Amino acid sequence: MSYEKELAAAKKAVTLAARLSQEVQKTLLQSQVWKKSDRSPVTAADYGSQAVVSLVLERELQPDKLSLVAEEETGDLRKNGSEAFLEDIAKLVKDTLASEESYTSSPLSTDDVLNAIDCGKSEGGCKGSHWVLDPIDGTRGFVRGEQYAVGLALLVEGKVVLGVMACPNLPLASAVCATDNSSQEDVGCLFFATTGSGTYVQSLKGNSLPQKVQVSSNENLDEAKFLESYHKPIPIHGTIAKKLGIKALPVRIDSQAKYAALSRGDAEIYLRFTLNGYRECIWDHAPGSIITTEAGGVVCDATGKSLDFSKGKYLAHKTGIIVTTKKLKPWILKAVRESIEEENLYF
């Protein structure tokens, strides 16, 4: 089945949501406000991004009922005392949509914005079609003016069939070679993939044609690179790297942008192991998983099984997430299993 119409709508939705987030990030950096609280700029970006994506999908696809699995809900926005904050969010959404020529004359009330955000209350599941959204992934990177992502995926009968990810601060060339002197014209990526059609990247500004990407062809673990967030990883990551003989320093990127970077060969390994009891949300991995697998990569748990997105808002797995290339997968699985056994860890 072709998903051309859905892909076009998703690309437009994510591009506009990224535009909103970039405006908020500018304000954030100027004001030096960084804490994510109920009425912080970070939260405004989350709400605004979710509203924009919901409204664009509704307008472009006109479904009988939009099913969106997403992070935000409007309970706090509907409380007394939140009126001014809600007005600020509504203005962000209106201004963003007005920047798209086809939406300039569309009226929008605060109730419209609230209802759009609350479209994200879907539970997902194994039946029907569900959009899955992370409106702002990578809060730490976002507040520092560094890497974050807006990720959107489409689930059909429990399978991810489409993914779009905007990485507004990711260089078009390579995350590894980026410098402080990188031209702003070369920054901002839009990755997208549909099942069976490969993964592509183009400028988020829309001024370049899509280019097909592939994961790294490197088979030498001595030359392989890890992708890690800036916050301190749990110790097993270091144990696994040592077993594999990894010599290169990790490529540090916050958010799902790590999936995107791996899909185009910036690095070969991304591991995500969390503390016991933590449940992974599907919006943190659905967009990135198809972007990586359609580029020739592998996304699985520590037993080698593919991730299951059909169980609702949370992934049904307990053993971490491994993102790598098909060539390196056997070695990484072996190192992961040995490390888990040696450290007597339970996930």
UniProtKB/Swiss-Prot annotation:
One of its GO terms (molecular function) is inositol-1,4-bisphosphate 1-phosphatase activity. It comes from the Eukaryota. Its cofactor is Mg(2+). Keywords: Calcium, Hydrolase, Lithium, Magnesium, Metal-binding, Multifunctional enzyme. AMP binds at S255, K258, R272, D284. Mg(2+) 3 binds at E71. The active site is at D46, T139. Pathway: Signal transduction; phosphatidylinositol signaling pathway. CDD domains: PAP_phosphatase. Substrate preference is 3'-phosphoadenosine 5'-phosphate (3'-PAP) > adenosine 3'-phosphate 5'-phosphosulfate (PAPS) >> inositol 1,4-bisphosphate. No activity observed against 2'-PAP, 3' or 5'-AMP, inositol 1-phosphate and fructose-1,6-bisphosphate. This is 3',5'-bisphosphate nucleotidase 2. The gene is SAL2.
